[in-house]
């Protein structure tokens, strides 16, 4: 191969000389010399025609040899005209005497051989070539730098194992170190490099250098033939020696199916097409279920909807139609608290005690021009027009102590004014006759009945005597009402829908006389409340038994209507008052409770107020009883 490259270079040089003449000849020769040096580094020529060193080599670190070239005019020179001289440094100084090569024959033509007698390690050498007495080339080195071991010998291989498929096998290659290298004694340490390839291949596969003389080779195909070679180098050196002879490895075919391994299953193509198919299917699913996937990932924002109302009305701004629809449905109606006196929210203006002593709200709000009806604590006004019945349970009894229902009697406006005047007159008489009133029996406490308005009203009566006594105390003791405000009227409605109560009318201490002298006195017991729309049979019997059998006609007494099924409170009051005296029985003074908290919310239109904690007398619980009909009352009445 080297000869053919040399001939090709010469042919190119000849063709270039033919075109460019004699001027191109030196340049062509230089290029040819460079090409030869690249092809074979050992072949070095001197363009000037002078000899030059090619290499110096020590195979075992005991001897070494150097080689050189003759030059271009080699044939014109006589043999022995080129000589080699060397010099070495002993200890710290170089010797001044140049010595000639000891052996020109042992290493071959154009070489000089230094045996062990002339070789010293760790000592620098300098050599030079002379021709006809003149120096043509010079080089300096040490022996350990030029070590290139001989190739290993005795290569062989052994089979380690065969794969389960019978296609691949593992072998181990062994060799012997170079015979002239004293490896056993450790004078030199060698590293080995193994290379292998299939027959008819050009690229060798190199394995990592090892210090041992055996290397395993894995995954060799049984139906192939391989070439193996080994070379060595001194440890920590970069120059390898010559390759060993090539070892041919032929593995027998152990399995009849080994040839099928040539046909490899196209896993790579299957994976590629599989991924492509899955991608296409995924895109098809996404496009086919686009809306559903969009709703799952990004759910739509719900449109505000009201049941029974078209959303287009809200978009177009037709608020009048929307309000009309809302007014039709009961669920959308707003509760107008201003129409009803019974509310769930009450706001009270609590004044300081100093302000209360200076003057109460009643003194500031009430005057002669604004007369309002006095509200008895036992009865609450209700302008809603709806009836209500409150039956609070007492001590887990089956029936309430007092059944409270709405009354149906209607009293004319003049009668209401006269009743208010009678109450004022009664308060004045209680002040004048306070010493004599103390002797009055408790069983003869009067019960004042007053119809406040023409509207039907709910009557809320507690089952204890404290509530009744409180009502009488508020009427009979004007001094206790000096700084007490009765919140019974609505003065304002807040934006939140709550109402603010204002004080009602109270008795004035300056009134000493009254225009109307009608006094209604009931001889019934204290625990019998005449304000009830209905009453028990036992209480009616007690009341009738205590009343004198004298019938006095009064212009305020309404007659019983025979068509009524039940007896009203007004009828019973009138009948009982015909035989009563004109004097009002006094009652003991007690603190008046201030109803400022809500006890029970009966309905959106009604509530029950709680009284503040007051010392209460012993409670007398009434047994439950039924209602008295008209026929039964006629039989009882005298």
Curated annotation (Swiss-Prot):
The processes (GO biological process) annotated in the record are: cytokine-mediated signaling pathway; endocytosis; growth hormone receptor signaling pathway; growth hormone receptor signaling pathway via JAK-STAT; positive regulation of cell population proliferation; positive regulation of receptor signaling pathway via JAK-STAT
Q: What is the effect of changing residue 595 to F?
A: Loss of transcriptional signaling
Chain positions carrying an annotated carbohydrate: 46, 115, 156, 161, 200
Give start-end of the signal peptide: 1-18
Ranges where the Fibronectin type-III domain occurs: 151-254
Reading the lineage from the top rank, the first entry is Eukaryota
Which loops or segments lie on the Cytoplasmic side of the membrane, by the record? Answer: 289-638
Describe the PTM. Answer: The soluble form (GHBP) is produced by phorbol ester-promoted proteolytic cleavage at the cell surface (shedding) by ADAM17/TACE. Shedding is inhibited by growth hormone (GH) binding to the receptor probably due to a conformational change in GHR rendering the receptor inaccessible to ADAM17. On GH binding, phosphorylated on tyrosine residues in the cytoplasmic domain by JAK2.
- Xref: InterPro entries: FN3_dom, FN3_sf, GHBP, Growth/epo_recpt_lig-bind, Ig-like_fold, Long_hematopoietin_rcpt_CS
Q: Which residues lie on this side of the membrane: Extracellular?
A: 19-264
Please indicate the residue ranges that the annotation assigns to the motif WSXWS motif.
240-244
Task performed by this protein: Receptor for pituitary gland growth hormone (GH1) involved in regulating postnatal body growth. On ligand binding, couples to the JAK2/STAT5 pathway.
Quote the subunit structure annotation.
On growth hormone (GH) binding, forms homodimers and binds JAK2 via a box 1-containing domain.
**Family indicated by similarity:** Belongs to the type I cytokine receptor family. Type 1 subfamily.
Name assigned to this protein? Growth hormone receptor
According to its UniProt entry, this protein's organism is Sus scrofa (Pig)
Q: Which gene encodes it?
A: GHR
């Amino acid at each position: 191969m080297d000869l053919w490259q040399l001939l090709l270079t010469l042919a190119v040089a000849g063709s270039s000389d033919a075109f460019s003449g004699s001027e191109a000849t030196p340049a062509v020769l230089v290029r040819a010399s460079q090409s030869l040096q690249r092809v074979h580094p050992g072949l070095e020529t001197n363009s000037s025609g002078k000899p030059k060193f090619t290499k110096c080599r020590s195979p075992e670190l005991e001897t070494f040899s150097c080689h050189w070239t003759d030059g271009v005019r080699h044939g014109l020179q006589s043999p022995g005209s080129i000589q080699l001289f060397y010099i070495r440094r002993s200890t710290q100084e170089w010797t001044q005497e140049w010595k000639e090569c000891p052996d020109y024959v042992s290493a071959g033509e154009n070489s000089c051989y230094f045996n062990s007698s002339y070789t010293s390690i760790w000592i620098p050498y300098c050599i030079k070539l002379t021709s006809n007495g003149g120096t043509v080339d010079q080089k300096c080195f040490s022996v350990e730098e030029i070590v290139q071991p001989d190739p290993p010998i005795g290569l062989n291989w052994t089979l380690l194992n065969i794969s389960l498929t019978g296609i691949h096998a593992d072998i181990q290659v062994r060799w012997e170190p170079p015979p002239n290298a004293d490896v056993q004694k450790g004078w030199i340490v060698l590293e080995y490099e193994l290379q292998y390839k299939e027959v008819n291949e050009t690229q060798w596969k190199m394995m990592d250098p090892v210090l041992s003389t055996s290397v395993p080779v894995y995954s060799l195909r049984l139906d192939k033939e391989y070439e193996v070679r080994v070379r060595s180098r001194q440890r920590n050196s970069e120059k390898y020696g010559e390759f060993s002879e090539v070892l041919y490895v032929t593995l027998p075919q152990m399995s009849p199916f080994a040839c099928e391994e040539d046909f490899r299953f196209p896993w790579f193509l299957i994976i590629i097409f599989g991924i492509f198919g899955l991608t296409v299917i995924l895109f098809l699913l996404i496009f086919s279920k686009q809306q559903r996937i969009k709703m799952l990932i990004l759910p739509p924002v719900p449109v505000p909807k009201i049941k029974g109302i078209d959303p287009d009305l809200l978009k177009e701004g037709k608020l009048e139609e929307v309000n009309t629809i809302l007014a039709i449905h009961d669920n959308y109606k707003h509760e107008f608290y201003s129409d009803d006196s019974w509310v769930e929210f009450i706001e009270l203006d609590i004044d300081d005690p100093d302000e209360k002593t200076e003057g109460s709200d009643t003194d500031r709000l009430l005057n002669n021009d604004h007369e309002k009806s006095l509200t008895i604590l036992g009865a609450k006004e209700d302008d809603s027009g709806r009836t209500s019945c409150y039956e609070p349970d007492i001590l887990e009894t089956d029936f309430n102590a007092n059944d409270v229902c709405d009354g149906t009697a209607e009293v004319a406006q003049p009668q209401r004014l006269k009743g208010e005047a009678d109450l004022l007159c009664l308060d004045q008489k209680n002040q004048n006759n306070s010493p004599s009133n103390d002797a009055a029996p408790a069983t003869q406490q009067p019960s004042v009945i007053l119809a406040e308005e023409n509207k039907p009203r709910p009557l809320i009566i507690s089952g204890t005597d404290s509530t009744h006594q409180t009502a009488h105390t508020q009427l009979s003791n004007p001094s206790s009402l000096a700084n007490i405000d009765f919140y019974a009227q609505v003065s304002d409605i807040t934006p939140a829908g709550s109402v603010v109560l204002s004080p009602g009318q109270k008795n004035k201490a300056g009134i000493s006389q009254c225009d109307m002298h009608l006094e209604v006195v009931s001889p019934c017991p204290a625990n019998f409340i005449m304000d009830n729309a209905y009453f028990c049979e036992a209480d009616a019997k007690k009341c009738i038994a205590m009343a004198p059998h004298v019938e006095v006609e009064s212009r305020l007494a309404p007659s019983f209507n025979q068509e009524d099924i039940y007896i009203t409170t007004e009828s019973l009051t009138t009948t009982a008052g015909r035989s009563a005296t004109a004097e009002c029985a006094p009652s003991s003074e007690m603190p008046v409770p201030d109803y400022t908290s809500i006890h029970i919310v009966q309905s959106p239109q009604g509530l029950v107020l709680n009284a503040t904690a007051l010392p209460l007398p012993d409670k007398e619980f009434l047994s439950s009883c039924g209602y008295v009909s008209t026929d039964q009352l006629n039989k009882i009445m005298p």
